[in-house]
Swiss-Prot record:
It is a multi-pass membrane protein. It comes from Arabidopsis thaliana. One of its GO terms (cellular component) is membrane. It comes from the Eukaryota. The chain crosses the membrane at residues 78-98, 104-124, 133-153, 183-203, 211-231, 324-344, 361-381, 405-425, 447-467, 486-506, 530-550. Pfam families: PTR2. Belongs to the major facilitator superfamily. Proton-dependent oligopeptide transporter (POT/PTR) (TC 2.A.17) family. PROSITE patterns: PTR2_1. It is found in: Membrane. Keywords: Membrane, Phosphoprotein, Transmembrane, Transmembrane helix, Transport. This is Protein NRT1/ PTR FAMILY 5.13. Expressed in roots, flowers and siliques. Detected in stems and leaves. The keyword NADP does not apply.
Amino acid sequence: MTTTSKTSLQEEYVIDAVDHRGFSARRSITGRWRAAWFIIGVEVAERFANYGIGSNLISYLTGPLGQSTAVAAANVNAWSGISTILPLLGAFVADAFLGRYITIIIASFIYVLGLAFLTLSAFLIPNNTEVTSSPSSFLNALFFFSLYLVAIGQSGHKPCVQAFGADQFDEKNPQENSDRSSFFNWWYLSMCAGIGLAILVVVYIQENVSWALGFGIPCVFMVISLVLFVLGRKSYRFSKTRQEEETNPFTRIGRVFFVAFKNQRLNSSDLCKVELIEANRSQESPEELSFLNKALLVPNDSDEGEVACKSRDVEDATALVRLIPVWLTTLAYAIPFAQYMTFFTKQGVTMERTIFPGVEIPPASLQVLISISIVLFVPIYDRVLVPIGRSITKDPCGITTLKRIGTGMVLATLTMVVAALVESKRLETAKEYGLIDQPKTTLPMSIWWLFPQYMLLGLADVHTLVGMQEFFYSQVPTELRSLGLAIYLSAMGVGSLLSSLLIYLIDLATGGDAGNSWFNSNLNRAHLDYFYWLLAVVSAVGFFTFLFISKSYIYRRVDVV
């Protein structure tokens, strides 16, 4: 085949991708934005469903379920954390066995089932907003079973849908690679549109009509999302696994760690073969090999059929190890991020929420400000700031993903500082008007005081969360793209669990509701301001640690065709 004809085929067909019939995917009729918008639509519906439950969950727990503020906040953080850690399992199933498409369909069925049971449990529990008596153990068990069934559905849905969407763009094609970077921006914008709709519509229904209806509407939206996803099948590109490999990527990479550990004490005199090392490794001697590179060696006394690990597998394993320090530092962002669905909402309950005579804003609805700031800023970032940055840095994305993440971490620190100052003002207002021991009395302080912290958190999300999605997707081996997004989600999940643990320990140390707890159920006697200052320090320390680590990070190389 001539070079010209080979180039023509590469332009017409996508390497390592097939269409719905299993044939090589044609660039002109599959993938890119025609397929991506189907998948983005699915995510809008899923986020509508998720936030239709989660955004006002603390109000349901402290209302109809009769839990204290500290216990409810811990339960929300625990559910949120587990929901974003379980995708590691879903990604494993998708990347090792079922593939993204089938995993999404199965996970969606589980998701719908969980929402249906959740609706049933809310229908059976009295629709109280004030605590009178706790529901029966059976109804409590049904509610939490349903809630965690939804989390299991999310485990397969969340990492695979976004990875499947990004798969519609060929990273080896310069134009499609640039479009893929835009995809992550528009994905997040559209996702926030679904979140905003849920916060405005579903939360209002939950607060003013019925919790059962408020949980039932998300269930209907998830059914719609599943139908929409299947309708777009003919336009999708499906990733091919490496044909020469008989084992799944987890087995190959796991073998690298096993062999490397076994070969740690080997030196050059013990070797009978070294797997050929590509590119910049070709000049390395055995003594210079790092821990994982020892997997490229075979000892003299090995069995006849024993072979060294392939250099590609070692590179894949090394890429995963490099992500660990970055992942750890992003936890400093994830812990403050967990607060907007819990304590931000509880602050709003105590404040003046009337916008028109007889019309009050549900406290959880203020979360829509995060979505609004994202919807407003993403187009500016994608269409204005990225081209400006591209002209200066020559980077197709404007700035590197790590710089984008770091910018968001700075904004998150600022968010916590502002939140602490606003909470101090709220406590001063309660003291000034003699309302410290009247927690159910509305303070003469507008809920719009919370506006800056919500908007700042939205700007931080545009940088850090979108940056993390693109970073972890692009830096893992091609066959593990679902895992890459699950790694990003797990950081947010572990952050939520750490937040829950931190709340528990601080509540224990400061005496609970009987003492001067920072999280006293009477927020006028609590000290959320102290907690926010603590989180500001955690976030700042995390940022400087991230800055140190990111300077030495080596990005994964992509071969462009």
